[in-house]
């Protein structure tokens, strides 16, 4: 399922414009850009941004089509996580204002109902944990059963790192898609997390795929990684070949080690969106957390016209998102149909 090669190709030389190469290689040939080629895209001057976004949109339309998948997420267990992901206000190791809390099953079902009413076809149950214990898995199982009895929607989960037995349990529950983000390039990961390894995350994703669930894996841009590491990350995702890549942009949270980092410039964020589309021409590329503070309304529109073909509507885990109505109105204005439930199965 690899869409891009990490090795240099004959087309990465400086004698030909990278967008001309991408038009031939990606748009016409369906082969994602390599790591070195993605780096060339990320280094394009700002006056090439409109051309880059237009090409990324063409690639998305050709290889993914016009439909946009809409997803809602809910936090089943918030805060108190033992891991030290430096961007995350849910870590119990930092002095952030987020406190540990659990959601009950009726509230979970109501959230799923509201998500389905928005036109979403995917509802993701998230927990702030290193990995699920028996109590949490039992709660997830009960929640999935209760949702299925009342709501027609695909159910995804994001519960941290899994054992082989837990992967099988989730598959048997009928989980449609499992999210576990690599977060950043392998070479930069130790700057972001020290309580577990990038390889441990990769192992979970491999087991999820082997069990027949869809793989959702992306990360957060703007955590201090270099452009070279951002290109490395795109190539690593292409090697993994996930069904979906959520792109988050760092929204610095008070009390976390990354709380004082600056927000990524909008032009840099849009170049990154387009570059990831050119590396992953057939993959669902989802706007996720941080887009509001990074891009605003105009930037969100440019992103959807620059390679994005999926969105999270409503709020995120610990930060506010755009109202679902705003995103749905934008998609309607752009004449982009929502992906139906049957098409997402």
Curated annotation (Swiss-Prot):
Instruction: Identify the EC number(s).
Output: 2.8.1.6
Which pathway does it take part in?
Cofactor biosynthesis; biotin biosynthesis; biotin from 7,8-diaminononanoate: step 2/2
Requisite cofactors: [4Fe-4S] cluster; [2Fe-2S] cluster
Give an example GO biological process: biotin biosynthetic process
User: Which Gene3D superfamilies does UniProt cross-reference here?
Assistant: Aldolase class I (3.20.20.70)
Q: Which UniProt keywords apply?
A: 2Fe-2S, 4Fe-4S, Biotin biosynthesis, Iron, Iron-sulfur, Metal-binding, S-adenosyl-L-methionine, Transferase
Q: Which GO terms describe its molecular function?
A: 2 iron, 2 sulfur cluster binding; 4 iron, 4 sulfur cluster binding; biotin synthase activity; iron ion binding
**Annotated positions binding [4Fe-4S] cluster:** 81, 85, 88
- Note describing how the cofactor binds: Binds 1 [4Fe-4S] cluster. The cluster is coordinated with 3 cysteines and an exchangeable S-adenosyl-L-methionine. Binds 1 [2Fe-2S] cluster. The cluster is coordinated with 3 cysteines and 1 arginine.
Domain Radical SAM core span(s) in chain numbering:
66-291
Indicate which residues the UniProt annotation says bind [2Fe-2S] cluster: 124, 157, 216, 286
Report whether Iron shows up as a keyword of the record.
yes
Which enzyme class?
Answer: transferase
State the reactions this protein catalyses. Answer: (4R,5S)-dethiobiotin + (sulfur carrier)-SH + 2 reduced [2Fe-2S]-[ferredoxin] + 2 S-adenosyl-L-methionine = (sulfur carrier)-H + biotin + 2 5'-deoxyadenosine + 2 L-methionine + 2 oxidized [2Fe-2S]-[ferredoxin]
PROSITE patterns given in the database record: RADICAL_SAM (PS51918)
Q: Which SMART domains match?
A: BATS, Elp3
Report the function annotation for this chain. Catalyzes the conversion of dethiobiotin (DTB) to biotin by the insertion of a sulfur atom into dethiobiotin via a radical-based mechanism.
Q: How does it assemble?
A: Homodimer.
> Which PANTHER family has this protein been placed in?
BIOTIN SYNTHASE, BIOTIN SYNTHASE, MITOCHONDRIAL
Q: Which family does it belong to?
A: Belongs to the radical SAM superfamily. Biotin synthase family.
This chain belongs to the protein called Biotin synthase
What organism is this sequence from? Mycobacterium avium (strain 104)
